[in-house]
């Protein structure tokens, strides 16, 4: 037995084979970090223990090829395959450089005799891959299979759930520590850096996001500004724990929280709780979205939403819970509910919680106290 074994945590071959048959696909070729990791265990994510395989993906791309009988082939750089390591796949194709990788794939495709077959690829599949297939294999067709992989990854295994819960606890610990240093005068870049440091110190293997805002400032960018008195601070953080992500938001206020802000926040938290309570097997994304809009209307609120949340896993927002989604909830899915409305001169106020869909009632994974913290 090898000293180090890398295996997928949630990949269900039988479910994949069934979905491939339903769609009439004979084989699939995966090239994105999330799906290669998901089907092979190859640690190519930015949140892997060593993210070098992700950083070098332009020179050493990686692929997972899965046939209709469930046979999984990993194609990867030889440098990652040397030594006392093992991957839980059926076959490995290796190469030394990008040119050799292209040649290896070409020969592999020819040996597999893909002529006249339907090959499934992701929408993000590199152009040179489809060109190789068309030039050397003459498949009957190339089909986009994002829907297959998204549906597979949506339902988490017990091992994946443990990873997501650990990632969530890491962020909650980091937020508890951050609250102690949030004070008027601190710069936003400094607070962002402190958030990263604390997530790593609490066990994160990577950073998902550090979406921190002061008042009405743009939270999506790190902007040089200093925190003032009587400002609302949004701490929206996500950690990666060996590729599995979290997404949590809590608020701090530099002063006494205005009564109207406090009551509006409590109202939004109640709406999030009500939507969270509806996360049961069989519930639809469309139905949840419509329910949220009705609650906004009932309470005289303006909705600042294009969705009511998202599933989470190897990506922060895997599938939206929106009016245009066909998602139907199943046990094992992990869903973030996040809802916001406006306050004052443009401040966004609301809440975000993470839930696990079970056979009966949803389980809230997030545990941090909800009220706005005064400092």
Range-by-range predicted roles:
Residues 1-375:
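Active-site neighborhoods and metal-handling regions in enzymes and metal-associated proteins
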